[in-house]
Curated annotation (Swiss-Prot):
Source organism per UniProt: Gluconobacter oxydans (strain 621H) (Gluconobacter suboxydans)
Descriptive protein name: 4-hydroxy-3-methylbut-2-enyl diphosphate reductase
Chain's role: Catalyzes the conversion of 1-hydroxy-2-methyl-2-(E)-butenyl 4-diphosphate (HMBPP) into a mixture of isopentenyl diphosphate (IPP) and dimethylallyl diphosphate (DMAPP). Acts in the terminal step of the DOXP/MEP pathway for isoprenoid precursor biosynthesis.
Gene Ontology molecular function: any one: metal ion binding
Gene designation: ispH
Keywords linked to the UniProt accession: 4Fe-4S, Iron, Iron-sulfur, Isoprene biosynthesis, Metal-binding, Oxidoreductase
Similarity annotation: Belongs to the IspH family.
Requisite cofactors: [4Fe-4S] cluster
Catalysed reaction, written as an equation: isopentenyl diphosphate + 2 oxidized [2Fe-2S]-[ferredoxin] + H2O = (2E)-4-hydroxy-3-methylbut-2-enyl diphosphate + 2 reduced [2Fe-2S]-[ferredoxin] + 2 H(+); dimethylallyl diphosphate + 2 oxidized [2Fe-2S]-[ferredoxin] + H2O = (2E)-4-hydroxy-3-methylbut-2-enyl diphosphate + 2 reduced [2Fe-2S]-[ferredoxin] + 2 H(+)
Amino acid sequence: MSEQTTFAPSRTDGVEAHKTLRVLLAGPRGFCAGVDRAIRVVEEALRRYGAPVYVRHEIVHNRTVVEGLEAKGAIFVEELDEVPEDGHVVFSAHGVPKAVPAEAQRRNLLYLDATCPLVSKVHREAERHFAGGGPDQRHILMIGHAGHPEVVGTMGQLPPGAVTLINDAEEARTIQPEDPTKLAFITQTTLSVDDTAEIVDILRSRFPLIEGPKREDICYATTNRQEAVKAIAPESDLVIVIGSPNSSNSQRLREVAERSGARRALLVPKLENLDWSVLEGVETLGISAGASAPESLVQEMVTALAGKYTLKIEERIVKEENINFRLPGPLAGEDD
């Protein structure tokens, strides 16, 4: 699906017309349902309980979103010991280890869990394979990136030693599990679809009895955004992915663009971080945004481009999205 528009500032001052720049907008892009839900959790908590509301870790990995919520009264912390005894606290979309809500309960904190439902699905898979540590237990191999909050949260659902992290294909080739016949794998939801498929193929080849998820762990939004970037990359001299450096899915979009034929791909947090010199010689520019980047950042960039170029904009939509996740627990009624 493709829609084309021309966006050109009017010139009546005799100045030479702007150079034409073709802009391919990847679709879908930007916020996913899990991110939208997490932000709504914080906003509704602020409305219901008043400021401050504490949030453990960045609610999503985007500074613009975080700063916007801070302006409304959210306070971001890394650990629960930074939350006062009578505080209200929200857990981020990435999920948390089981010890975190247990500690919140011990301290009688009112907490709201904004973990993305698709991340919670992976948590349930891990617990199913662990099987309570009984005779049906399988050792779990988690495909993901060390230190990412989602990985920390998922591995923290089970006792130490129950899960081994697989960072890349080389680790999949060399791991030596104690019992190769009793294995299962799960994955971080924001990985490269292609990289993960390679790792899964290696694991299945080495360990034919390994069990995997009934449905793909990589979330629909990650998959759709990567497919959209693949659709624009071959025609693009440059692809700009709007997103924060600590956003896993945004980093993967940049990598996908490079691998899919773009001459160059850059991750740019927002307009003020753009080095305009990178556009020299660019005739076709692709633009996408990570799942935690608001559409306002895309429109801000397009507007700035229109001040320097005559734009021919094409929307390349590979998939329509209409998914909505309900708010958790005490806030659930606000969706009705």
